[in-house]
């Protein structure tokens, strides 16, 4: 599917020491480190949220959130992987009632360890089953799709690859940019492992490097390289382009986006989502907070601020030229399986990519 308009090194230290499976599950937009969560307030007098999404995004919603919950809300910001690892280390002593993750992998890890509470059908039914936990213990709140950014001065639209697997072909030698240390790229590779298998993914990574793909620090740097013509293609999340267009105007942005067809691994949709923690004494307040985050007001806010797709039924994005969510040809995958990021990191290290 071709459409016309086309965050930070992985958390390894703290999360890796606490839970190897989470070592690579870093947040793209996290604020301060997970240590900020350690001094959360009294859970009996307020709701405490551990948030892998940053303060700049969450703070404007706090007033409305407290009204919806009916009590004071404290938010502790950090990297999603580190926060999830901290929750597992704290066990029933955790002061968090709600975990708001930047990605599905961290939620999948908590679900796997039995730390999330089953959610009521009324909450689950607000989100398509593809974007919630298979055990019914977390839901996605907003989605982002992997795309190819391309420079139309360097490559014609009708010559674009139909699969991310094709960027290792000779015609794309030295022409592809990617961000191997970025959490979103690592989640994409994890998705490829789930969909295509470890052997095929390992071969693709080896071929990607051999084909001269250029590594950059993050998605924005990849987009910059596409813009300048340094590379013809870039592997990124969709919203970086839309944020740049909102800032500069489409006529000032050279790059365009290619939404891959056919349920390609390169069209993976990952989500930011949330789950209610078990045995914290905050279940009722946490559930109210989660339902607020699925409300039209909150969903519209996230869509407008992040350019991500709202996931609650009945809410659509107002972002100009963003393809309808239903039109995306994303692969069928259990997003909870993205928790196996440690294996991905090992694979990337073996290929000399991180």
Describe these PLM feature segments.
Residues 20-24:
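C-terminal motif of bacterial Sec signal peptides marking the signal peptidase cleavage site
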Residues 26-29, 35-108:
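Early extracytoplasmic/lumenal segment of secretory-pathway proteins
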Residues 51-59, 78-82, 94-231, 265:
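Extracytoplasmic ligand-binding site segments that recognize negatively charged/polar headgroups
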Residues 105-109, 232-254:
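A ligand-binding cleft/hinge motif common to bilobed small-molecule-binding domains
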Residues 149-154, 193, 269-282, 301-305:
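A bilobed periplasmic-binding-protein/Venus flytrap-type ligand-binding module shared by bacterial periplasmic
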Residues 199-200, 308-354:
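An extracytoplasmic/periplasmic, membrane-proximal ligand-sensing/linker region
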């Amino acid at each position: 599917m071709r459409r016309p308009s086309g965050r930070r090194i992985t958390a390894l230290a703290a999360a890796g020491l606490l839970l190897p499976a989470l070592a690579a599950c870093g947040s793209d937009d996290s604020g301060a480190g997970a240590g900020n969560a350690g001094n959360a307030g009294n859970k009996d007098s307020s709701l405490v949220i551990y948030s892998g999404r940053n303060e700049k995004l969450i703070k404007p919603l706090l007033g409305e959130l407290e009204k919806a919950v009916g009590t004071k809300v404290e938010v502790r910001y950090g990297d999603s992987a580190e926060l999830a690892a901290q929750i597992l280390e704290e066990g029933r002593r955790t002061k968090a009632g709600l975990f708001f993750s930047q990605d599905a992998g961290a939620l999948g890890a908590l679900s796997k360890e039995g730390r999330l509470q089953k959610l009521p059908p009324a909450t689950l039914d607000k989100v398509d089953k593809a974007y919630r936990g298979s055990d019914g213990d977390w839901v996605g709140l907003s989605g982002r799709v992997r795309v190819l950014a391309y420079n139309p001065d360097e490559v014609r639209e009708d010559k674009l690859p139909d699969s991310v697997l094709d960027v290792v072909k000779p015609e794309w030698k030295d022409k592809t940019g990617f961000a191997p240390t970025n959490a979103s790229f690592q989640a994409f590779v994890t998705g490829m492992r789930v969909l295509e298998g470890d052997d095929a993914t390992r071969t693709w990574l080896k071929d990607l490097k051999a084909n001269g793909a250029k590594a950059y620090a993050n998605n924005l740097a990849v987009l910059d390289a596409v813009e300048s013509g340094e590379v013809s293609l870039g592997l990124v999340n969709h919203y970086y382009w839309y944020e740049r267009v909102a800032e500069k105007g489409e006529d000032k942005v050279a790059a365009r986006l290619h939404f891959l067809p056919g349920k390609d691994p390169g069209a993976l949709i990952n989500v930011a989502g949330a789950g209610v923690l078990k045995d914290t004494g905050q279940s009722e307040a946490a559930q109210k907070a989660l339902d607020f985050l699925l409300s039209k007001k909150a969903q519209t806010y996230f869509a407008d601020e992040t350019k991500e797709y709202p996931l609650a039924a009945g809410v659509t994005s107002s972002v100009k030229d963003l393809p309808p969510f239903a039109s995306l040809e994303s692969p069928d995958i259990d997003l909870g399986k993205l928790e196996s990021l440690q294996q991905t990191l090992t694979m990337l290290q073996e290929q000399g990519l991180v």
